[in-house]
């Protein structure tokens, strides 16, 4: 590749922020501009999400009042952009609304201290008070008849409650995507409420929607964590790798533009700038659909859809076909005599080009693996370009990638084989033992949640064709481990977890995989009450029964971290038989009272 091309790409990279999407300086009133672009329905939905994500304890009715006030003000500004306060930034307008709430300090304590700050510090302060694990009651879905009655009486209020409940429990949920899920939810209700058996129609559809929405939430949280901890450069590298895999026929200039725009709008949503984010996401979708010829042959079906469905479809579009006869990577990145000169003159562009070329050739790799390879290449050039004979030093760099590639491949193979042998529930239990031994100080509910989510990787990824397994497994696990890290950062208890969570995001999964049993942990004292159960467990749904048993398994491992597999299987087998027997007994509680102490005694003996 000639160096003039690099200079062109450098120009493209530096100028991308000023192209296309980002033209907000031209508008006298930002809020009027966003209202006109988004339309009233989406505007109100986004404002509701924003307030729900910042003020997670407030009831729905209070948020609706704020939303209506902001919407009325926006309409005033649409009518006259020079009206009072219409020229204020959205941060200022939203921050002033939050700070005007009379009960702010009573309800949110230290959050009220943010109001003494000026923008942008005030908004940053609000962001720091978002709670990833708010103290809210579990959301219980009403029965189908009650839901249909509420939906048919007032669909707008019904869907408003949905946005509010999801947003306050997931304060980093990707706002325009949440609007998409609300649309899907509404369509399910419209379809199913006309059916004779409403529950049979609603339950499986909403369960599937919930699963997808939760996956979307953890993926977005990983993106926000990456931006918060490592900044735009790290996220843009992720975006370049992913876009290059999806759109291998697009040139580097096009990929750079898409990655830059995606980085900007993702940062907006992560910073709570939801109106800008949603508007810019729609603009990016428009740009992609207007430039399909230079991006991908797979976009047309998405581009025929309305805005929310279009953006969602584009984010999940299948990878385009690889270009024919791609040249060897070695020519530009190993054999070229000016590798060190090209690297020194524009490091980020040179590395970005390497990442682009490698990623477009490897849709079968995870983004995290591609970034580890780019990091290895960068470290090799840093070392070798300072030596007397650089080319002799970096000549084998592509061969040195092999161990980095083999490690996740072996992980996927071993875990998918284990999943196929044990099934999802058994695989989750194996992960519970593994992760409790690595981090026994972590709370039992967090370990159960993490292991159950990690265990879903089997049914999600191991069923895919071989070429799709690695990216599915590692990128999914990265998102789940980020959830563990976010919760652990709030209340750190394990030095091993802290070590993995504070390092590089792309090294996090290998770090967790390599963690040994924590030898510093002092085993928990055995308490009979931890393993005492009553007849009420028999009436629980199967999922909740599983979680009770898995919590007991965590506690067993915390009591005996070095328990062997056969020991744990013996105890779990006895426990399952005990539950089966007592739940079938005529006098269930008497059975639990009589056989429970025997189970506790035999468990202690088995683990002795």
Curated annotation (Swiss-Prot):
It is found in: Secreted. The modification Phosphothreonine is found at residues 444, 446, 570. The modification N6-succinyllysine is found at residues 460, 543, 588. Gene3D superfamilies: 1.10.246.10. Cu cation binds at residue 27. Belongs to the ALB/AFP/VDB family. Its main location: secreted. It comes from Mesocricetus auratus. This is Albumin. Disulfide bonds join 77-86, 99-115, 114-125, 148-193, 192-201, 224-270, 269-277, 289-303, 302-313, 340-385, 384-393, 416-462, 461-472, 485-501, 500-511, 538-583, 582-591. The keyword Zinc applies. Zn(2+) binds at residues 91, 271, 273. Residues 19-211, 212-403, 404-601 form the Albumin domain. Binds water, Ca(2+), Na(+), K(+), fatty acids, hormones, bilirubin and drugs. Its main function is the regulation of the colloidal osmotic pressure of blood. Major zinc transporter in plasma, typically binds about 80% of all plasma zinc. Major calcium and magnesium transporter in plasma, binds approximately 45% of circulating calcium and magnesium in plasma. Potentially has more than two calcium-binding sites and might additionally bind calcium in a non-specific manner. Plasma. Ca(2+) 2 binds at residues 37, 279. GO terms for molecular function: enterobactin binding; lipid binding; metal ion binding. Residues 19-24 form a propeptide. The modification Phosphoserine is found at residues 29, 82, 89, 297, 443, 513. Interacts with FCGRT; this interaction regulates ALB homeostasis. Interacts with TASOR. In plasma, occurs in a covalently-linked complex with chromophore-bound alpha-1-microglobulin; this interaction does not prevent fatty acid binding to ALB. Keywords: Calcium, Cleavage on pair of basic residues, Copper, Disulfide bond, Lipid-binding, Metal-binding, Methylation, Phosphoprotein, Repeat, Secreted, Signal, Zinc. Ca(2+) 1 binds at residues 30, 268, 273, 276. The modification N6-methyllysine is found at residue 558.
């Amino acid at each position: 590749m000639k160096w003039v091309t690099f200079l062109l790409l450098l120009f493209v990279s530096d100028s991308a922020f000023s192209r296309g999407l980002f033209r907000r300086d031209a508008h006298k009133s930002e809020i009027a501009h966003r209202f006109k672009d988004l339309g009233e329905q989406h505007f109100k939905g986004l404002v509701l999400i924003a307030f729900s994500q910042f003020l997670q304890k407030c009831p729905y009715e209070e948020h609706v009042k704020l939303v209506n006030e902001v919407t009325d003000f926006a309409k005033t500004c649409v009518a006259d952009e020079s009206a009072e306060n219409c020229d204020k930034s959205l941060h200022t307008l939203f921050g002033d609304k939050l700070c005007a709430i009379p009960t702010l300090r009573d309800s949110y304590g230290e959050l009220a201290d943010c109001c003494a700050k000026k923008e942008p510090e005030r908004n940053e302060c609000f962001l720091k008070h978002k709670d990833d694990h708010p103290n809210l009651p579990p959301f219980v879905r009403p029965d189908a008849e009650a839901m249909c009655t509420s939906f048919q009486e007032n669909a707008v209020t019904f869907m408003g409650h949905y946005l509010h409940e999801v947003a306050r429990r997931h304060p980093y949920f990707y706002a325009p995507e949440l609007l998409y899920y609300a649309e899907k939810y509404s369509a399910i209700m419209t379809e199913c409420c006309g059916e004779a058996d409403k529950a049979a129609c609603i339950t499986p559809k909403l369960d599937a929607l919930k699963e997808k929405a939760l996956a979307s939430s953890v993926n977005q949280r990983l993106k926000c964590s990456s931006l918060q901890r490592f900044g735009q450069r790290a996220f843009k590298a992720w975006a370049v790798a992913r876009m290059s895999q999806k759109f291998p026929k697009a040139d580097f200039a096009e990929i750079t533009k898409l990655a830059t725009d995606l980085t900007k709008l993702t940062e907006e949503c992560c910073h709570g700038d939801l109106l800008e984010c949603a508007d810019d996401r729609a603009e990016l979708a428009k740009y992609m659909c207007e430039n399909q010829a230079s991006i991908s042959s797979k976009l047309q079906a998405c581009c025929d859809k309305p805005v929310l469905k279009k953006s969602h479809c584009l984010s999940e579009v299948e990878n385009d076909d690889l270009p024919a006869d791609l040249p060897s990577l070695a020519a530009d990145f190993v054999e070229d005599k000016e590798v060190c000169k090209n690297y020194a003159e524009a490091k980020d562009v040179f590395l970005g080009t390497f990442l682009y070329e490698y990623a477009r050739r490897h849709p079968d790799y995870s983004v995290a693996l591609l970034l580890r390879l780019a990091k290895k290449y960068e470290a090799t050039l840093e070392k070798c370009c300072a030596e007397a004979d650089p080319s002799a030093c970096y000549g084998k760099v592509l061969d040195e990638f092999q161990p980095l590639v083999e490690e996740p491949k072996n992980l996927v193979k071993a875990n998918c084989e284990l999943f196929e042998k044990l099934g999802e529930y058994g695989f989750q239990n194996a992960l519970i033992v593994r992760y409790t031994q690595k981090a026994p100080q972590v709370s039992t509910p967090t370990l159960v949640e993490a292991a159950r989510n990690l265990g879903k990787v089997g049914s999600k990824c191991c069923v895919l064709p071989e070429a799709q397994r690695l990216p599915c497994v590692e990128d999914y696990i990265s998102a789940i481990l980020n959830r563990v890290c976010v919760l652990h950062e709030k209340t750190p208890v394990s030095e091993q977890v802290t070590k993995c969570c504070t390092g590089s995001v792309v090294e996090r999964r290998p770090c967790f995989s390599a963690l040994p049993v924590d030898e510093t942990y002092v085993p928990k004292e055995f308490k009979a009450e931890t393993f005492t159960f009553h007849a009420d467990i028999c009436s629980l749904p199967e999922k909740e029964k599983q979680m009770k048993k898995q919590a007991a398994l965590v506690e067993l491992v915390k009591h005996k971290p070095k328990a062997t597999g056969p020991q744990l299987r013996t105890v779990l087998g006895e426990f399952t038989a005990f539950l089966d027997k007592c739940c079938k007994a005529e006098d269930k509680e008497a059975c639990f009272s009589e056989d429970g102490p025997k189970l506790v005694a035999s468990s202690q003996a088995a683990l002795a």
